[in-house]
């Protein structure tokens, strides 16, 4: 019967088309404006009214008990075939997983204009089994409750009344008989006649092209004007989260899980608390103390970088909650942690990053406003406690993967005002409101290991004098370590490793780490606060944001390119305090490093200039250390560190000359025909060619650096780096060849000529103190694999680090920008054309002929009188730029002349063949050895202290385990039960001892497996 009904309906439609095309005068319809349509009016005029179908025309409407708010549309035959099988009544309510079981973006309900053939999204992997959708139903506010909160009422709708809820019963959907026919576009059918084609108006305009492809089951959000009560004159909204997100949340017992809070902030971050703004952690049932405040700053990074960092933070929060025996943390430890995500510029944020935030429930489109109560909005603050996480593969992770709730604050700044301003929002606005104990700073793209944040927090918990802590930054080597095939990535991997093995431990022993990396660092919030007069670390830290005009001299501007170094110095040198900085090697974070030459040079320009000027600042102000409350021993150590930094600064400044002189004396030793390894005096010719090539590239380097950006001169910089690598390789070959000759002579072999004992000792000591100590300390820290995979690339690019990077940095000291920020000011001095109605605008213009004539007369009078036009002068910004460039020129000239004079003087005093009596070469080699030995001593001291600390902690845990075991045994004896089998007399049962042994073995294997590092 259903098949016959379907064929009859299709024949009816075909008959209607044929009849209408042949007899158009019989088929004229009148439009009834009182008729209620469930959809938008069709583009064709005189649309017919079609009564509802009979029982034979379509199946009766069926409602599903489990989805009362999403009824399915009735099935009806299509025009493409005689008969189509209707959908099965037992069809599943869940479709296949999109990627990993994550919910589809569409709303599969006819209530929202969705497709009737689109089933419901799949059940998430972490949804509770056995629960139905009735348990997760929430009211979306059909006139009863406003989803935006505040009890506002709808004023008007942009789209007018909508009837999509009743679309499945609309009278305009079905055909009752042959007299009530649907008017259709006849161009869609092949059987239409030429007469029918002539009915179509060729000039008919269908409107503009759609901006994007329409998706089945997805409808655009429909906006409506509402009245919302302002809170203290500010806009604060409580918005319901999406229904599909709410449906699979494990916890829905509090408003922080079911509503997202939006606040439009119209003040400066320094006035956030004074203006009465409050966060969720300060109001109502969510009023809590904040122990850990995590800041994630981002600019325009995509969703992959964001989810990598955010998922790592969520894993760390889960680790905090897993420490059930901790006095601070435990099952509800997430309530003491707040994650603050700050995006620098609403126009700069990546759209897919906003999509990732929306998937977590933190962000909703269409809520933010530019102006509130005639005040411009400076930041949009979204607050939500999310219970799901997205990993870097965009797969949802929930409670089944150990993810716990996370309190998130998303601050979307209206304008791009650089990273320093983002930190001002974090510390001065949200930090003052929450008053946290510890603040952790992260950059988007850095993936902290699951226990990294706990180890950072533990450093503050164990020592009350710690004001800041730095984690170990590890370079990302790509999948299967394929990134090491890129020499840039490999050299940076070696540099990061040796810095974490030699430099950071040494500075940690002294108590002053020159820089806490913004990618992974932590601060004690109390230590950062200013004094009563407003002077202190934060005041100095944020001074770089407000430098303008005469105050922004080149030295200060470049110094604040590395403002985190200034903050570290101000903490250690804080008056009448005894704060120290620590390096936490167990807090590891992985970050991406530049893999292209332009990106690499641009990054190091800011690092080198900031580090150089910040080091000068700390050395000049070293006397501030004597006004602190440090012990005498600590003050002496800090003075020694200042001397060490001064030596490093001198070597950095004369790096060009020292590199050239080392090549000149070592490679020049092979110009003697007696020890020429190539014969025919080839050693001399090779030395001459490489010498002039090296000098030529150094000269060209200044032209490249002053006249070209790295992005526009990639091949030039690549060529110079290749030449430097060849020079370095030949110098290394000459060094090894001379050492082999000397060793052969000392063992009795007949060699034509030997080095002097002094030169031999100098070279050997220098090599052993660098390469030898690199191997020794790497094996001491059980992390030697970078010596085999990345050391060759690093030493090959070492001249480029010294020459190319340093030259580009000094030649661009006038560039003190972090990025580009355009001028977004709109000038209104000419007036505006205000739209009145449609294409009619209101403008100001001369209204009478007399006004036009007076303007003409004024022009003629000015020509006759020859009035002098006042000179506008040079703008302040142009004066500042000229000043920066002039100082840059003086600075580069002095630096270049100093290096050239040093190289020429030493090379003239000591010739090529006088290496044995070369005092300057001996000073250079022994200075390198002394500095390397100091670093090795500091690294060894840090390792010893770290080992002692772990032994003390292990002993304390062991004793606590003995006490707990004794108490358990006593309790078991009193109850007449037998306790666990003990292992020896140590108080540990067999199971605990086996578990501890397994853990120790596993930990050792993880450290030994280089492919996981």
Curated annotation (Swiss-Prot):
Residues 154-173 have a biased composition (Polar residues). GO terms for cellular component: cell periphery; cell septum; cellular bud neck; plasma membrane. Residues 64-81 have a biased composition (Low complexity). Mainly expressed in the metulae, phialides, and conidia. Glycans are attached at residues 10, 194, 316, 837, 967, 980, 989, 995. Pfam families: Chitin_synth_1 (PF01644), Chitin_synth_1N (PF08407). It is a multi-pass membrane protein. Induction: Expressed specifically during asexual differentiation but not during either vegetative growth or sexual differentiation. Expression is stimulated by osmostress. It catalyses: [(1->4)-N-acetyl-beta-D-glucosaminyl](n) + UDP-N-acetyl-alpha-D-glucosamine = [(1->4)-N-acetyl-beta-D-glucosaminyl](n+1) + UDP + H(+). The chain crosses the membrane at residues 646-666, 686-706, 721-741, 759-779, 792-811, 892-912, 919-939. Residues 26-83, 95-218 are annotated as: Disordered. It is found in: Cell membrane; Cell septum. One of its GO terms (molecular function) is chitin synthase activity. It comes from the Eukaryota. Disruption phenotype: Does not affect hyphal growth. Leads to a remarkable decrease in the efficiency of conidia formation. Exhibits growth defects on media supplemented with sodium dodecyl sulfate (SDS), high concentration of salts, chitin-binding dyes, or chitin synthase competitive inhibitors, when chsC is also deleted. Keywords: Cell membrane, Cell wall biogenesis/degradation, Glycoprotein, Glycosyltransferase, Membrane, Transferase, Transmembrane, Transmembrane helix. Its EC number is 2.4.1.16. CDD domains: Chitin_synth_C (cd04190). GO terms for biological process: cell wall organization; chitin biosynthetic process; conidium formation; division septum site selection; mitotic actomyosin contractile ring contraction. Its main location: membrane. Polymerizes chitin, a structural polymer of the cell wall and septum, by transferring the sugar moiety of UDP-GlcNAc to the non-reducing end of the growing chitin polymer. Seems not to be involved in hyphal growth, but, with chsC, chsA shares critical functions in hyphal wall integrity and differentiation. ChsA and chsC share also overlapping roles in septum formation. Invoved in the production of the asexual spores (conidia) that are formed by differentiated aerial hyphae called conidiophores. Belongs to the chitin synthase family. Class II subfamily. This is Chitin synthase A. The lineage of its organism: Eukaryota, Fungi, Dikarya, Ascomycota, Pezizomycotina. The gene is chsA.
């Amino acid at each position: 019967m259903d098949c016959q009904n379907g064929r009859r309906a299709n024949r009816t439609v075909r008959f209607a088309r044929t009849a209408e095309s042949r007899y158009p005068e019989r088929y004229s319809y009148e439009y009834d404006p009182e008729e209620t349509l469930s959809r938008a009016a069709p583009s064709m005029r005189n649309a017919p009214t079609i009564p509802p179908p009979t029982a034979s025309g379509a199946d009766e409407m069926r409602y599903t008990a489990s989805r009362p708010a999403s009824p399915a549309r009735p099935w009806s035959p299509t025009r493409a075939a005689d008969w189509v099988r209707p959908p099965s009544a037992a069809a599943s309510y869940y479709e296949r997983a999109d990627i990993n079981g994550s919910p589809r973006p569409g709303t599969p309900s006819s209530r929202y204009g969705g497709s009737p053939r689109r089933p419901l999204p799949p059940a998430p992997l972490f949804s509770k089994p056995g629960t139905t959708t009735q348990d997760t139903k929430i009211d979306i506010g059909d006139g009863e409750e406003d989803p935006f909160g505040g009890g506002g009422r709808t004023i008007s709708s942009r789209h007018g009344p909508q009837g999509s809820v009743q679309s499945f019963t609309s009278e305009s959907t079905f055909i009752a008989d042959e007299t009530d026919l649907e008017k259709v576009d006849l161009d869609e059918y092949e059987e239409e006649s030429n007469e029918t084609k002539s009915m179509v108006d060729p000039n008919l305009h269908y409107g503009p092209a759609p901006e994007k492809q329409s998706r089945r089951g997805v409808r655009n959000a429909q906006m409506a004007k509402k009245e919302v009560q302002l809170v203290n004159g500010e806009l604060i909204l409580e918005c319901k989260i999406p229904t599909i997100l709410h449906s699979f949340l494990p916890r829905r017992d509090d408003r922080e899980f079911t509503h997202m809070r939006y606040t439009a902030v119209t003040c400066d971050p320094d006035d956030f608390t004074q203006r009465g703004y409050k966060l969720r952690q300060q109001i109502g049932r969510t009023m809590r103390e904040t122990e850990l405040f995590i800041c994630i700053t981002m600019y325009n990074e995509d969703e992959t970088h964001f989810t990598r960092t955010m998922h790592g933070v969520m894993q760390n929060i889960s680790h905090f909650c897993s420490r059930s025996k901790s006095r601070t943390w435990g099952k509800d430890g997430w309530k003491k942690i707040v994650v603050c995500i700050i995006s620098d510029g609403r126009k700069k944020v990546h759209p897919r990053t906003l999509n990732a935030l929306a998937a977590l429930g933190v962000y909703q489109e269409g809520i933010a406003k530019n102006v509130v109560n005639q005040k411009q909005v400076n930041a949009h603050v979204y607050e939500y406690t999310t219970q799901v996480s997205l990993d870097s593969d965009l797969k949802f992770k929930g409670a089944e993967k150990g993810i716990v709730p996370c309190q998130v604050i998303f601050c979307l700044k209206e304008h791009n005002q650089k990273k320093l301003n983002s930190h001002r929002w974090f510390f001065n606005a949200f930090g003052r409101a929450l008053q946290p104990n510890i603040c952790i700073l992260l950059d988007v793209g850095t993936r902290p290991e699951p226990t990294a944040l706990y180890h950072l927090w533990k450093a503050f918990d164990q020592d009350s004098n710690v004001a800041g802590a730095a984690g170990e930054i590890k370079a990302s080597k790509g999948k299967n370590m394929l990134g090491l095939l890129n020499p840039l990535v490999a050299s940076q991997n070696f540099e990061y490793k040796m810095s974490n093995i030699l430099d950071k431990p040494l500075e940690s022993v002294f108590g002053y780490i020159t820089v806490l990396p913004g990618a992974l660092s932590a601060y004690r919030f109390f230590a950062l606060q200013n004094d009563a007069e407003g002077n202190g670390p934060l005041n100095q830290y944020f001074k770089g944001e407000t430098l303008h005009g005469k105050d922004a001299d080149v030295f200060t501007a470049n110094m604040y390119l590395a403002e985190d170094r200034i903050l570290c110095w101000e903490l250690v040198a804080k008056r009448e305090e005894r704060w120290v900085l620590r390096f936490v090697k167990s807090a590891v974070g992985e970050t991406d490093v530049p893999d292209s030459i332009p990106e690499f040079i641009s990054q190091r320009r800011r690092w080198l200039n900031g580090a150089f000027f910040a080091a000068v600042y700390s050395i000049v102000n070293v006397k501030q250390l004597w006004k602190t409350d440090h012990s005498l021993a600590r003050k002496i150590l800090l003075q020694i560190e200042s001397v060490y930094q001064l030596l490093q600064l001198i070597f950095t400044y004369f790096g060009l000359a020292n590199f050239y002189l080392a090549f000149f004396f070592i490679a020049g030793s092979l110009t003697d025909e007696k020890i020429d390894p190539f014969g025919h005096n080839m050693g001399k010719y090779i030395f001459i060619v490489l010498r002039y090539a090296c000098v030529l590239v150094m000269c060209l380097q200044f032209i490249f650096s002053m006249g070209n950006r790295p992005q526009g001169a990639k091949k030039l910089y690549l060529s110079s780096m290749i030449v430097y690598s060849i020079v370095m390789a030949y110098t290394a070959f000459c060094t090894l060849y001379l050492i082999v000759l000397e060793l052969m002579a000392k063992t009795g072999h007949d060699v034509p000529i030997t080095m002097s004992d002094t030169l031999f000792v100098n070279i050997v000591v220098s090599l052993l103190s660098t390469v030898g100590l690199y191997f020794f300390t790497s094996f001491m820290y059980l992390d030697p694999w970078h010596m085999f995979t990345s050391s060759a690339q690093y030493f090959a690019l070492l001249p480029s680090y010294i020459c190319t990077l340093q030259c580009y940095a000094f030649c661009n000291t006038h560039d003190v920008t972090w990025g580009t920020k355009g001028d977004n000011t709109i000038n209104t001095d000419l007036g505006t054309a205000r739209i009145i109605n449609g294409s009619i605008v209101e403008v100001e213009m001369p209204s009478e002929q007399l006004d036009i004539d007076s303007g003409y007369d004024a022009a003629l009078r000015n020509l006759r009188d020859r009035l002098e036009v006042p000179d506008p002068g040079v703008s302040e910004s142009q004066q500042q730029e000229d000043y920066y460039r002039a100082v840059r020129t003086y600075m580069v000239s002095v630096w270049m002349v100093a290096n050239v004079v040093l190289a020429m003087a030493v090379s003239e005093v000591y010739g090529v063949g006088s290496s044995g009596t070369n005092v300057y070469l001996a000073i250079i080699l022994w200075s390198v050895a002394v500095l390397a030995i100091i670093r090795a001593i500091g690294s060894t001291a840090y390792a010893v202290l770290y080992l002692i600390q772990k032994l003390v902690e292990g002993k304390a845990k062991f004793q606590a385990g003995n006490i707990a075991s004794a108490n358990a045994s006593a309790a078991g004896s009193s109850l007449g039960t037998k306790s666990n089998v003990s292992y020896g007399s140590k108080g540990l049962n067999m199971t605990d001892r086996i578990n501890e042994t397994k853990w120790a073995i596993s930990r050792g294997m993880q450290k030994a497996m280089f492919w996981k590092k």
